[in-house]
Amino acid sequence: MYSVLQLLKCLCSCWRKGPEGRRFQTEAAVCARPAWSPHPAGASEALGALPPPRQLVEKRRVSPPRRLDQSGRDGGAVAKCSLSRGLSPPGWTGRSLLRPWGSAAVLGSRAALACVLRPSRGVMPATIQSRR
């Protein structure tokens, strides 16, 4: 099996020589034939074995976790929880902590994520506890 660089180099040199050139036949044989060849060890099969370009570069998308309560009542609980665990970096305001995914996305720690997903009952106000 040839590397992609060798195949591309060979295909470029074969293409430059053209079908009239003498070295075209030998280079095509040495380089596992050009991409239009139906040969089983052809360059098209070797290039087809590569993953699509989308998989070569992994992009990590940080998706915000779902809010526990759709009305937004858990925002204060998350802020208190992350502050009580000492996860808030200096310079953060209380407003930026009210977003439930703020600390988890920036810090990327499991503690912050667990805190966002499961705020402890001791942090929640008594009114919210009585409604549940």
Curated annotation (Swiss-Prot):
This is Putative uncharacterized protein FLJ34945. Residues 39-93 are annotated as: Disordered. Residues 56-72 have a biased composition (Basic and acidic residues). It comes from the Eukaryota. It comes from Homo sapiens.
